[in-house]
Amino acid sequence: MKNGLEDYYVIRGNKKMRFGYTTGSCAAAACKGATEILLGGKLQETVTLMTPKGILLTLELKDIQIETDKVTCAIRKDAGDDPDTTNGILVYATVEKTKEQGITLDGGIGVGRVTKAGLSQKIGEAAINPVPKSMILRATTETAEKYDYEGGLKIIISVPEGVEIGKKTFNPRLGIVGGISILGTSGIVEPMSEAALVQSIRVEMKQHFSQGEEYLLVTPGNYGADYLREHMDLPYEKNIKCSNYVGETIDMAIDMGVKGILFIAHIGKFVKVAAGIMNTHSHSADARMEVLASNAIRAGAPLECAKEILNASTTDEALDILNRYQMTQGTMKEVLDRIQFYLNHRSYEQILLGAVVFSNTCGYLGQTADAAKLIEQINIQNEKIKDK
C-alpha cells in the first residue's frame, strides 16, 4: 500500500534514503482512525493524515478493538531509512465517549512521564510534545465535527514497546520516565536527520539552564563522560552530551543566555577544534594528524617527528610518537591554545568557553586558558543549587 512518501527521499553517500513519519503522526493518525470508527460506526482499514510539512499520509490501521463507546487502534511507525529506535513499533490510540464536554488527552503505557522542570510539558504530564498534541486534538476535533458529535471524548496514547525503548533514548537524562516521547515538528522523519539530534541537545541544555545552570558541563561522548566521572571533581550528573556538534552547542548556548561551557573531551574528537572544525564527525572533516603534526612543528619538533605523526592511524599512536620525541607537552600547549582561539572565534567571545582534553592511554593532556575559571564557576554554581 502506498503511504504518500514514495516520492520523498534524500541522497546521502550515493544512496537514495526514504523519508518516514514520526511517532506524533502515528498517534494523530491512530486517533483519527479510532474516532472515525467510534463516531461513524463503520470499520475502516486506512486513515489519511495531513502532516505539518504538507505531506498527506495514507496509513493502515492495525489491531482494531471495538467496545461499547470505545475504540482502540494502532499505526505502525515507519522511520524510513533513518536509524530510529522506534522504527516498527505500534503506536496506539484509544478514544472513548464521555459525559463531560470537551476532549482530554493523556498518555498510557509506554508513553513517558515528565518528572523534571524545563520541558514543554509540566511535571506529571505525559511526554507528548506540543506539535503532536496539536495534531492529535485537531484530527479528533475535525472528525467529531464531521459527524456532528457534541459530546466529550477521552484520548489515551500508548506504546507497549515504549517502556523498554525509552531507556535507550535521551529521556532518562531529561527526567522522562516510563517510556518514549511522542515527537515530531513536521510529522515527517528525514533520514539521518542531524536537525533532530541537535534539537534533542537543545532540549537537554534548556532543561539544565532552567534549573539554574548558567555554566554548562558538556562532553562530546561516552569517553568524555567516563573521564569526567572517574577523574574530575565536578558534578558528573550535570553533564550534557553534545555528540559531534560543538559549534551548534555553542550557538544554542549563546541563544538561550548561557554564561559559559566547559568541554571535557577526548583528544581524538577535540583536536579537530584546533583547526576550527566545529562538527567533529569524520564524515565532515578529519585533520587530526595534520593538526598534531603542524602544532608539533610549531612547538619545535623535528621534521621527522611530524612525518611520523602524519603516517599515524590514531591519536594514541601520534601521542606515542610525541612522547618518544619528548614533544607531547609543547605540542599540546600549542593545540590547546588553538582550541581556545577557535572556541572564542565561534562565540565572538560572547560567553566563557574552555576545554579539558585527555586520551585513554595518556590520561590528562591539558586544558585551555579559560578552563580553570569554568571549573571554579561550575563548582560554585553546584553548591548554590544544592543549597536551594
Please annotate each region the language model reported.
Residues 1, 93, 191, 387-388:
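Intrinsic structural disorder
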